[in-house]
Design a protein with these regions (language model features):
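Secretory targeting and sorting signals
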Residues: 2-41
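Active-site-proximal beta-strand/loop segments in catalytic clefts of secreted hydrolases
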Residues: 54-57, 82-87, 116-119, 140-144, ...
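Structural motif
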Residues: 50, 136-137
Length: 280
């Protein structure tokens, strides 16, 4: 698959500019013709979103805190945090037979949350089955550590997102590169951008039949959060993936074409990939 460069999760500016000019020309031609209520309907803001935020690093982890605080800046978002009580990295899609118990907790910034004594997927199940939550979208992360290539199948972050998708709810897993100073503000911003770009569609979400895939974002640690952009691509194949991931991304690289998420990530891009709901 040939990769696509995205700007804040959208097509490049030139493409958007062309579309905008066409829209303006069409709108000008229709001035005074549209029904009186059309302008009001077009300007109507989409309904607020209920966003279930979870992770695998635990409810008090800095990554989930960054995502929650970033999502809360938009007052249209109702952010509900349900996450494992402790670190469950590497849990994949494991779940507890009969479910796991939960109780009140807070994030690192003091936002009210529910801590579940189980796996990341258990936290999602608790939100649906015990709290009877009906979210528009599930956001899992930001994880401490990238989940590239085949590592999605052992990731609790991805496992939680997959559980949401099995419930028929669109889901995003977001992960930040390992390092002494993980750039959570960048991965949190990318999560917000992803939600915003899909806001109108997400507002119409009705849980039902299981979805077939989730989205996964992986962000490298670049100086001052200056990732080169978002590159939509496919996951790297299994053999040799771990050795191919660089510990320090080349954020000053000038390469622009990549075969998979590992190559783009190594060159300073955040990657956006589609991940099947069921593990390989």
């Amino acid at each position: 698959m040939r990769g696509r460069h995205l700007v804040n999760g959208r097509a490049p500016r030139s493409a958007r500019a062309t579309a905008l000019i066409s829209t303006l020309i069409a709108a000008t031609a229709l001035v005074g013709v549209a029904p009186a209520g059309a302008a009001h309907a077009a300007a109507k803001k989409p309904a607020p979103l209920t966003i279930l935020v979870t992770n695998d690093d635990g409810v008090a982890a800095p990554g989930i805190d960054a995502v929650v605080e970033a999502l809360r800046t938009d007052k249209r978002n109702k952010v509900v945090v349900v996450a494992p009580a402790t670190n469950n990295s590497g849990a994949g899609g494991k779940s507890t037979p009969g479910g796991a118990p939960g109780g009140p907790a807070t994030t690192a910034s003091g936002y009210a949350a529910t801590a579940v004594q189980g796996y990341p997927a258990d936290a999602v199940d608790y939100a649906f089955d015990v709290m009877h939550l009906t979210p528009n979208v599930v956001v899992s992360g930001a994880n401490f550590g990238q989940n590239l290539g085949p590592f999605v199948d052992v990731s609790g972050t991805v496992g939680a997102a997959r559980e949401g998708a099995r419930r028929g709810v669109p889901a995003l897993a977001v992960s930040q590169q390992l390092g002494d100073a993980p750039d959570y503000p960048t991965s949190a911003r990318l999560a917000v951008d992803w939600v915003q770009a899909r806001r109108r569609a997400l507002a119409r979400t009705k849980a039902g039949a299981a979805l077939t895939e989730i989205d996964s974002i992986n962000a490298p640690n670049c100086p001052a959060g200056r990732i080169r952009g978002v590159y939509e691509t496919t996951a790297a194949p299994g053999p040799g993936t771990e050795a191919a991931i660089r510990t320090v991304a080349e954020c000053a690289s000038t390469a622009t074409t990549f075969a998979n998420d590992v190559e783009a990530f190594n060159a300073g891009y955040a990657t956006l990939t589609k991940v099947p709901v069921h593990a390989a």
